[in-house]
Curated annotation (Swiss-Prot):
Family: Belongs to the MetA family.
Organism this protein belongs to: Pectobacterium atrosepticum (strain SCRI 1043 / ATCC BAA-672) (Erwinia carotovora subsp. atroseptica)
UniProt xrefs under PANTHER family: HOMOSERINE O-SUCCINYLTRANSFERASE
Pfam families per the UniProt record, alphabetical: HTS
Protein name in the entry: Homoserine O-succinyltransferase
Gene name as annotated: metAS
């Protein structure tokens, strides 16, 4: 079954052009199926691009999914039309009394910003605390992982001296875990961050299971034993040209960025890169939806019984 989205959302035509089955809300109402309710807190500046990336991965599942987009930054956006935000996004006050099967919190370009200087830090803390009682399973991506580790476990912000950018080799540490079911023993995934996630720090300060790690990128995928929390420190949702766009943007800004590792053919930015992580990204999201959301969420969300302390 497909994802359910508002009829006029730009992602509808974008994904249909890729032969992705998208069901508009008007058509979905004719089916007597209880869809999974998934809330997406989109923290990225280019919201439409990020919507397309995540909805692509969420659509590759036999489950029908009702997507609700959430924003917590009330400032005027420089990268997304106000009309789009008004038409397709809700504010936290609109949904705070609702329950959801899943929540995805995206990354944000805040790698070198102290938590106390993040304008919407109180709001993101509120959402994460709210999710304990209102969401079956939450998936944090990249910067959101760092924020959640601080809010939930008190782990301070850790940053690298140089930005981690490129496509890195990862090792599946727990191949029989539900979230890694079907993963190759080694696979590639993109990263673009200053945040540092040393596996030993996560083991020392949390009870999370580290499922996948990388010698260069550190802990990549980890989760709580009750499946309520999942963390991915990279960007499996990225399009093939996303890293290139970031690299050339930084070049134009005079930042002299390092060429992303293992990305451009022959490390030559003039050559077009190829995506080597698509199958992994799809499998990760299908596993999360199936094993962490669908199989443990109640049919009646009013009867949600959270297990997270």
């Amino acid at each position: 079954m497909p994802i359910r989205v508002p009829d006029e959302l730009p992602a509808v035509n974008f994904l249909r052009n890729e032969n992705v089955f998208v069901m508009t809300s008007s058509r979905a109402k004719t089916q007597e199926i209880r869809p999974l309710k998934v809330l997406v807190l989109n923290l990225m500046p280019k919201k439409i691009e990020t919507e397309n990336q995540f909805l692509r991965l969420l659509s590759n599942s036999p489950l029908q999914i009702d997507i609700q987009l959430l924003r917590i930054d009330s400032r005027e956006s420089k990268n997304t039309p106000t009309e789009h935000l008004n038409n397709f996004y809700c504010n936290f006050d609109d949904i705070q009394d609702e329950n959801f099967d899943g929540l995805i919190v995206t990354g944000a370009p805040l790698g070198l910003v102290d938590f106390c200087d993040v304008v919407y830090w109180p709001q993101i803390a509120r959402v994460i605390e709210w999710a304990k009682e209102h969401v079956t399973s939450t998936l944090f991506v990249c910067w959101a992982v760092q924020a959640a580790l601080n809010i939930l476990y008190g782990i301070p912000k850790m940053t690298r001296k140089e930005k981690l950018s490129g496509v890195y080799l990862h090792q599946t540490l727990q191949p029989h875990a539900l979230l890694t079911r079907g993963f190759d023993e080694t696979f590639l995934a993109p990263h673009s961050r200053y945040a540092d996630f040393p596996a030993d720090v996560i083991r020392q300060h949390t009870d999370l299971d580290i499922l996948v790690a990388s010698e260069q990128a550190g802990a990549y995928l980890f989760a709580s034993k009750d499946k309520r929390l999942a963390f991915v420190t990279g960007h499996p949702e990225y399009d093939v040209l996303t890293l290139a766009g970031e690299f050339f943007r930084d070049c134009d800004a005079g930042l002299d960025p390092t060429v992303p590792v293992n990305y451009f053919p022959e490390d030559n930015p003039e050559l077009e890169p190829k995506a080597s992580w698509r199958s992994h990204g799809h499998l990760l999201f299908v596993n999360w939806l199936n094993y962490y959301v669908y199989q443990i969420t109640p049919y009646d969300l009013r009867k949600m019984n959270p297990t997270l302390d």
